């Protein structure tokens, strides 16, 4: 990764993060959903965004597949590319947090080091790790994109959970049982956001 030129200086905005948060009526944070493919990350994140939208919370959902259509379309699935994928998403999420948004991200993000990298970039108190913990057998049975079948057949290499490791969070802010109903999981997340005074509605 290239270092920026010494003449590139960070520009401070006249409108502060606190002013933006006051305008939105809630704090800016990242909810980082992590888990195996098929664990329900995107489904739960989407349902939570819908619930937050109904509460007039300003949100944005960054989904793993979607960012690879544009922002990260040049990246593959090597360890180096996966790390760069997460770094870019972390930078975008951080900018959105500074805009006062509640940012939801749904990425396998299999390595603890990359998730920690984003946590440090965003800052403590503004990064909520959400572990959607679903057994591999359940994820494989769901297999919404047919990826596990391809991985088992040897047609897809470096697939997380099959021939590439997933490092489960050791101390996520919230640990969700991915076999529960989505409505139950959304309620647990809303309760967490209220308990941490991120949203008040």
UniProtKB/Swiss-Prot annotation:
GO biological process: hydrogen sulfide biosynthetic process; sulfate assimilation
Family to which this protein belongs: Belongs to the APS kinase family.
Keywords: ATP-binding, Kinase, Nucleotide-binding, Phosphoprotein, Transferase
Role, per record: Catalyzes the synthesis of activated sulfate.
Lineage of producing organism: Bacteria, Pseudomonadati, Pseudomonadota, Gammaproteobacteria, Enterobacterales
EC number: 2.7.1.25
Domain of life per record: Bacteria
GO molecular function: adenylylsulfate kinase activity; ATP binding
SUPFAM superfamilies: P-loop containing nucleoside triphosphate hydrolases
Pathway terms, separated by semicolons: Sulfur metabolism; hydrogen sulfide biosynthesis; sulfite from sulfate: step 2/3
Reaction(s) catalysed (UniProt annotation): adenosine 5'-phosphosulfate + ATP = 3'-phosphoadenylyl sulfate + ADP + H(+)
Record keyword Transmembrane helix present: no
Protein name: Adenylyl-sulfate kinase
Residues that bind ATP: 35-42
Organism: Shigella flexneri
Active site as annotated: 109
UniProt-listed Pfam families: APS_kinase (PF01583)
Top-tier EC class: transferase
Keyword Phosphoprotein: yes
């Amino acid at each position: 990764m290239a270092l920026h030129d010494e003449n590139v200086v960070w520009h401070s905005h006249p409108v502060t993060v606190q002013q933006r948060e006051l305008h939105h009526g809630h704090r800016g944070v990242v909810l980082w959903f992590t888990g195996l493919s098929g664990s329900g990350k995107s489904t739960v994140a989407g349902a939570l965004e819908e619930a937050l939208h109904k509460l007039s919370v300003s949100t944005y959902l960054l989904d793993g597949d979607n960012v690879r259509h544009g922002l990260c379309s040049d990246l593959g699935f090597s360890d180096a590319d996966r790390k760069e994928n997460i770094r870019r998403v972390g930078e975008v999420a951080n900018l959105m947090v500074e805009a006062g948004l509640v940012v939801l991200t749904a990425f396998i993000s299999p390595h603890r080091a990359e998730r920690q990298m984003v946590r440090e970039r965003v800052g403590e108190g503004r990064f909520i790790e959400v572990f959607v913990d679903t057994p591999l057998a359940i994820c494989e049975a769901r297999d919404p994109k047919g990826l596990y079948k391809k991985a088992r057949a040897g047609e897809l290499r470096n697939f997380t959970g099959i021939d590439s490791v997933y490092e489960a969070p050791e101390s996520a802010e919230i640990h969700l049982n991915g076999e529960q109903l989505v409505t139950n999981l959304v309620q647990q997340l809303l309760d967490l956001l209220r308990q941490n005074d991120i949203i008040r509605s």
